[in-house]
Amino acid sequence: MSHHWGYDSHNGPAHWHEHFPIANGERQSPIAISTKAARYDPALKPLSFSYDAGTAKAIVNNGHSFNVEFDDSSDKSVLQGGALDGVYRLVQFHIHWGSCEGQGSEHTVDGVKYDAELHIVHWNVKYGKFAEALKHPDGLAVVGIFMKVGNAKPEIQKVVDALNSIQTKGKQASFTNFDPTGLLPPCRDYWTYPGSLTTPPLHECVIWHVLKEPITVSSEQMCKLRGLCFSAENEPVCRMVDNWRPCQPLKSREVRASFQ
């Protein structure tokens, strides 16, 4: 039985180290990105997204966020390039968000918090399966995309509409024919650094690529996220808001930029 971690005062990020001591590790995420301190690296490649909408399969409320899950049994939906060696398979995406505008993202840029942050998660095919990839420093590649309230994002509406069927913890629904490329901003410039999962078990297995350019979603779309519940159907209602981890110490790491 895993420890019931969450985002509340009694089980939130300040307590995670009690059950997951790696929370105080050397390469934890998220971090505060400083544009001045990031080093431009001309050797970094463009990110190459090659997704097949046919691999989308389900949307799940796991009591911490919602995951859109993909069939990762073949190389139909993959990420390559960036700071990566080899091929990384798409497994899921999820979002972290706030209770109000001005907070919700996990990474920050020059002290600025965005309203939400989308994480697209991939695992290194050389490790054979996701669970094995978690044990390696180059096991996962996560692309982080900042979200801010502004114009509606038509490409995310299908996701927003599906939330009605997974309002409470433990619910899941079929979610098919979806290509997450539509969620990316036009500019694919990024910062990259070695880090971790931002939720327990907090494994230090992630090569992060945080895109410089945010996407916008409407306030209505944002409100639908805040309408989800941390709680199960048979429990008192607990709204799913502020499911983000604060920035962690950079320690000896370097942040590199793909752009000048």
UniProtKB/Swiss-Prot annotation:
Enzyme class: lyase
Activity modulation notes: Inhibited by acetazolamide.
Main location: cytoplasm
Name of the protein in question: Carbonic anhydrase 2
Catalytic reaction annotation: hydrogencarbonate + H(+) = CO2 + H2O; urea = cyanamide + H2O
Source organism of the structure: Gallus gallus (Chicken)
Keyword Transport: no
Domain of life of the native organism: Eukaryota
Domain Alpha-carbonic anhydrase: 3-259
Gene name tied to this protein: CA2
Its job: Catalyzes the reversible hydration of carbon dioxide. Can also hydrate cyanamide to urea.
Keywords: Cell membrane, Cytoplasm, Lyase, Membrane, Metal-binding, Zinc
rRNA processing in keyword set: no
Subcellular location(s) of the protein: Cytoplasm; Cell membrane
Residue stretches spanning the membrane: none
The family this protein is said to belong to: Belongs to the alpha-carbonic anhydrase family.
